[in-house]
Amino acid sequence: MAKRDYYEVLGVSRDVDGKEVKKAYRRLAMKYHPDRNPGDASAEEMFKEATEAYDVLSDDQKRAAYDQFGHAGVDGNAGAGGFGGGASFSDIFGDVFGDIFGGGGGGRTRANRGSDLRYTLDLDLEEAVRGTTVKIRVPSQVECKSCSGSGAEKGTQPETCGTCNGAGQVRMQQGFFSIQQTCPRCRGAGKIVRNPCRSCHGSGYVEEQKTLSVKVPAGVDTGDRIRLSGEGEPGVNGGPPGDLYVQVAVREHKIFTRDGRNLYCEVPISFVDAALGGELEVPTLDGRVKLKIPEETQTGRLFRLRGKGVTPVRGGAPGDLLCRVVVETPVNLTKKQKDLLREFQTSMEESGGQQAPKKHSWFEGVKSFFDDMKF
């Protein structure tokens, strides 16, 4: 079943601010919370749907990705712009209702998947069309060797949090609500570090640069993403790592522009070739090909070279190369050349406009326009 629009789910317009998004979610969460609707599967689904919508629309980066790409931009707890790790229902609900039940919904309360990361990969058009393999260097959080990931100074150990007894969560009861909240003392870690490691400052991780090999499939275009599973941030409390999303950005080409599977280029020709016709070589990504120019060709005419475009990344027939002719006006003429052109112009005028029909038609239209004007 297709997902509903997140703005529709919360009953808000697309231009509302974060406060209105939060207000709409509070209203729906109070109405459909499972503790208020025991055994009602429909209410539970409505609650989950509202929570999912709030998770995206309350985050500026996720919301921007959703506005641009729809559900595809935020599926898998990742968006085209933010790529934050996914939050659990209890985290989100605690964030919204923490002021009611005491304590905010800060850190993660259980084993959570690590955050996704994004890397922008600049490619030449030829690389994007043919495919390539590139090496990239990205920052990575790795386990601190000094403390073996405990976050505590060597020779010491973290203590079990006495507030939550190591669970990382405390249960709050208010009326018909019974909600697990992140422990305010240990922030969900379940442990307290009395003597933080000086290398990682108590986090258990240090940042290093790592080199990854990225296989770029043929046919990718700007905006396409390549997913490297498990290469994101490390998980929290034993959770799995996130993913690294490599986003493609194709550099501007000096000859070709791309539109989907088709390529476009401009081909300058002399006015003699335009008038008399001829044959010239034009570039393609596979080499040079002959292009026949018929006589009386005008600027702007498109010539299609079938199959000389791009094969889509998901397969299918290759596109075409469309060459747009631009008739070039000669410059730096000699006196003799100018005299010949004046002689040619005189002969053109004697033809009564038959050899320049567009020009003749335009001037006739202008003359008629002024004749019809009343002064």
From Swiss-Prot:
Function summary: Participates actively in the response to hyperosmotic and heat shock by preventing the aggregation of stress-denatured proteins and by disaggregating proteins, also in an autonomous, DnaK-independent fashion. Unfolded proteins bind initially to DnaJ; upon interaction with the DnaJ-bound protein, DnaK hydrolyzes its bound ATP, resulting in the formation of a stable complex. GrpE releases ADP from DnaK; ATP binding to DnaK triggers the release of the substrate protein, thus completing the reaction cycle.
Family: Belongs to the DnaJ family.
Quaternary organization: Homodimer.
Domain J residues, every copy: 5-70
Positions with a binding annotation for Zn(2+) 1: 144, 147, 197, 200
Taxonomic path: Bacteria, Pseudomonadati, Pseudomonadota, Gammaproteobacteria, Oceanospirillales
Zinc finger (CR-type): 131-209
GO term, biological process aspect, one: protein refolding
GO molecular function: ATP binding; heat shock protein binding; unfolded protein binding; zinc ion binding
Keywords of the record: Chaperone, Cytoplasm, DNA replication, Metal-binding, Repeat, Stress response, Zinc, Zinc-finger
Localization annotation: Cytoplasm
Species, as recorded: Hahella chejuensis (strain KCTC 2396)
Residues forming coiled coils: none
Cofactor note text: Binds 2 Zn(2+) ions per monomer.
Keyword Metal-binding: yes
Gene: dnaJ
SMART domains, per database record: DnaJ (SM00271)
Chain sites annotated for binding Zn(2+) 2: 161, 164, 183, 186
InterPro entries associated with the record: DnaJ, DnaJ_C, DnaJ_domain, DnaJ_domain_CS, HSP40/DnaJ_pept-bd, HSP_DnaJ_Cys-rich_dom, HSP_DnaJ_Cys-rich_dom_sf, J_dom_sf
Domain notes from UniProt: The J domain is necessary and sufficient to stimulate DnaK ATPase activity. Zinc center 1 plays an important role in the autonomous, DnaK-independent chaperone activity of DnaJ. Zinc center 2 is essential for interaction with DnaK and for DnaJ activity.
CXXCXGXG motif repeats: 144-151, 161-168, 183-190, 197-204
A Pfam family: DnaJ_C
Cofactor: Zn(2+)
PROSITE patterns for the chain: DNAJ_1, DNAJ_2, ZF_CR
Name used for this protein in its record: Chaperone protein DnaJ
Record's keyword annotation contains Ribonucleoprotein: no
GO CC field: cytoplasm
Main location, first listed in the record: cytoplasm
